[in-house]
């Protein structure tokens, strides 16, 4: 009997379990397969949990477009899109939100919608889409776009942040004077400062979409390569983990091994040698590495390198150049329901009018929103430095900061179902309706198994780096029959392979990108062994 090829998949997240599922179901028992997971659970950056008796997502949350998404297909086929239990469905949408500027001023929807339209149009232009604006606005937007791109093209590298700034500046140049005059009913806010702050609010939301600490680090050219599925974006009623459990359900008992952290990958000999944190060693013919880009970044920089020999330059350079950020979610439980969705407009950090009681890390969150229309659980998103700071704070510090922020922005305008208002930038002790009873936060940045949330194409990198991430090792030069200068016949192919969202050129940062990457590497091995699939 021929010896089975030994395949070890590192990581039991979306990419790893997709690869394992495909290899097991399509190989006709060709492989000796195992999935080793460093943590105590499967799912990776997918982690469905419960808070206040409601289903929530600590990590991946959205199906980004239902038209053609493999994640949507699985969720639909498994009946995971409907539930009798409350979940983070986000039906209390931002379309219904109240928008408040610092100082207690509720902003007229027409003002917010105008800047929202500008920001959306600029992002659509950056992404190479046809902008969804009326004909009357197209000529003005064309002028703004041309001006913004002309200004940005003067630099060697253009970022999304610099494009957006140039676009906003061009917008202001295109309208009448009076930007520094006050806006009636908005206190010390001028029209320009108010609209600029609203624009910044939308930029902060964009930071959570991309995981970039600053949009000035996000590459402009690569933005148009990123692809999204058509259709609405939805959450999964029975939880994102239902998709993960479906993928894992076909695997025999024992294939998935938890609490098995790989500390060293020795490659370039006849077989790959994996070292584990408990001192054990496993040999494999092929290893599929699905750890996060953050773990790979740490693995090539530390004294105890993850790979031996070190990764070739083309691979390590791509790892260094690509961006990888932190996005965290904060859930707070209110003592009563019927809290409105809020959009938060903050003054500049250097403004003499800002409320100093608002902590710096709260100033770059854009929304506080109930997770569904009848929920007393509110959700805010944080990115970058603010997300990392959130991880360090105690529950009491978070409660105080959130309520101080809500109070300073809403003043006396927001009322709940008991009609008790917030007053004077602080809370009354007897205002039970506005009490936060408990909090829950994600901690993706400080978790050594992830070291962050998801990847982005940073200024100085490109889609080519994402392709380089997907290249298996050793890299074979078939034209000369050599691998890294050695005779190809003496080197085992496909020793170390790579999957995960950071290895997909057009769907990076998404669960479906991770799914496609796992499928890609499984198919690469199936083709190598001439399996019918």
Curated annotation (Swiss-Prot):
* Temperature and thermostability: Optimum temperature is 40-45 degrees Celsius with thermospermine as substrate. Optimum temperature is 35-45 degrees Celsius with spermine as substrate.
Describe cofactor binding as the record notes it. Answer: Binds 1 FAD per subunit.
Protein task = Flavoenzyme involved in polyamine back-conversion. Catalyzes the oxidation of the secondary amino group of polyamines, such as spermine and its acetyl derivatives. Substrate preference is spermine > N(1)-acetylspermine > thermospermine > norspermine. Plays an important role in the regulation of polyamine intracellular concentration. Involved in xylem differentiation by controlling thermospermine homeostasis, and participating in the tightly controlled interplay between auxin and cytokinin that is necessary for proper xylem differentiation.
Q: What happens when the gene is disrupted?
A: No visible phenotype of seedlings under normal growth conditions. The double mutants pao1 and pao5 exhibit enhanced tolerance to salt and drought stress. Increased length and thickness of floral stems. Increased length of roots. Delayed transition from vegetative to reproductive stage. Increased levels of thermospermine.
Which InterPro entries does this one have? Answer: Amino_oxidase (IPR002937), FAD/NAD-bd_sf (IPR036188), Flavin_monoamine_oxidase (IPR050281)
Keyword terms: Cytoplasm, FAD, Flavoprotein, Oxidoreductase, Stress response
Swiss-Prot/TrEMBL GO biological process terms: regulation of timing of transition from vegetative to reproductive phase; spermine catabolic process; thermospermine catabolic process
| Reaction catalysis annotation | spermine + O2 + H2O = 3-aminopropanal + spermidine + H2O2; N(1)-acetylspermine + O2 + H2O = 3-acetamidopropanal + spermidine + H2O2; norspermine + O2 + H2O = norspermidine + 3-aminopropanal + H2O2; thermospermine + O2 + H2O = 3-aminopropanal + spermidine + H2O2
Name of the protein described by the UniProt record: Probable polyamine oxidase 5
Q: What induces it?
A: Induced by salicylic acid. Down-regulated upon treatment with flagellin 22, a pathogen elicitor. Induced by auxin, cytokinin and thermospermine in roots. Induced by spermine, thermospermine, N-acetylspermine and spermidine in roots.
Originating organism: Arabidopsis thaliana
Q: What is its EC number?
A: 1.5.3.-
Give the cofactors, semicolon-separated. Answer: FAD
**Record localization:** Cytoplasm
Q: List the disulfide bonds.
A: none
């Amino acid at each position: 009997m021929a010896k089975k090829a030994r395949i070890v998949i590192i990581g039991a997240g979306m990419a790893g379990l997709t690869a394992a599922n495909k290899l097991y179901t399509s190989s006709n028992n060709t492989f000796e397969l195992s999935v080793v997971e460093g943590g105590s659970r499967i799912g990776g950056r997918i982690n469905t949990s419960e808070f206040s008796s409601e289903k929530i997502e600590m990590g991946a949350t959205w199906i980004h477009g239902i038209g053609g998404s493999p994640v949507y297909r699985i969720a639909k086929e498994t009946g995971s899109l409907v539930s009798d239990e409350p979940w983070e469905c986000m039906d209390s949408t931002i379309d219904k939100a109240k928008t408040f500027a610092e100082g207690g001023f509720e902003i007229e929807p027409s003002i917010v919608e105008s800047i929202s339209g500008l920001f959306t149009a600029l992002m659509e232009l950056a992404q190479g889409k046809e902008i969804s604006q009326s004909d009357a606005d197209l000529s003005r937007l064309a002028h703004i776009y041309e001006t913004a791109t002309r200004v940005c093209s003067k630099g060697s590298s253009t970022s999304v942040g610099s494009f957006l700034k140039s676009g906003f500046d061009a917008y202001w140049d295109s309208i009448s004077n009076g930007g520094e005059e006050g806006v009636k009913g908005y206190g010390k806010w001028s029209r320009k400062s108010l609209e600029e702050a609203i624009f910044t609010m939308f930029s902060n939301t964009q930071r959570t979409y991309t995981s970039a600490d600053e949009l000035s680090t996000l590459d402009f050219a690569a933005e148009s390569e990123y692809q999204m599925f058509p259709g609405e974006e939805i959450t999964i009623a029975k939880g994102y983990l239902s998709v993960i459990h479906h993928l894992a359900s076909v695997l025999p008992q024992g294939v998935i091994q938890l609490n098995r952290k790989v500390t060293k990958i020795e490659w370039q000999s006849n077989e790959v040698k994996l070292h584990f944190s408990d001192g054990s060693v496993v040999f494999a013919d092929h290893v599929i590495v699905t750890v996060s880009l953050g773990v790979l970044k740490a693995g090539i920089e530390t004294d105890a390198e993850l790979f031996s020999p070190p990764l070739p330059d083309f691979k390590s350079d791509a790892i260094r150049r690509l961006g990888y950020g932190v996005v965290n979610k904060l859930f707070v439980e209110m003592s009563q329901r019927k809290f409105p969705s809020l959009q938060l407009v903050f003054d500049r950090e250097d403004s003499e009018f800002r409320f100093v009681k608002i902590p710096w890390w709260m100033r770059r969150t854009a929304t506080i929103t109930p997770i569904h229309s009848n929920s007393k659980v509110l959700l805010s998103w944080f990115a970058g430095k603010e997300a990392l700071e959130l991880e360090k704070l105690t529950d009491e510090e978070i409660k105080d900061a959130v309520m101080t922020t809500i109070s300073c922005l809403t003043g006396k305008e927001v009322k709940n179902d008991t009609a008790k208002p917030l007053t004077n930038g602080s809370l009354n002790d007897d205002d039970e309706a506005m009490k936060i009873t408990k909090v829950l936060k994600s901690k993706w940045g400080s978790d050594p198994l992830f070291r962050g949330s998801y990847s982005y194409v940073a200024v100085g990198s490109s889609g080519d780096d994402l392709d380089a991430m997907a290249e298996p090792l050793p890299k074979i030069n078939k034209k000369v029959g050599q691998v890294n200068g050695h005779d190809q016949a003496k080197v085992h192919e496909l020793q170390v392979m790579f999957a995960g969202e950071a290895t997909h050129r057009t769907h990076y940062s998404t669960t479906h990108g991770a799914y496609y990457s796992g499928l890609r590497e499984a198919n690469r091995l199936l083709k190598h062994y001439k399996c019918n699939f």
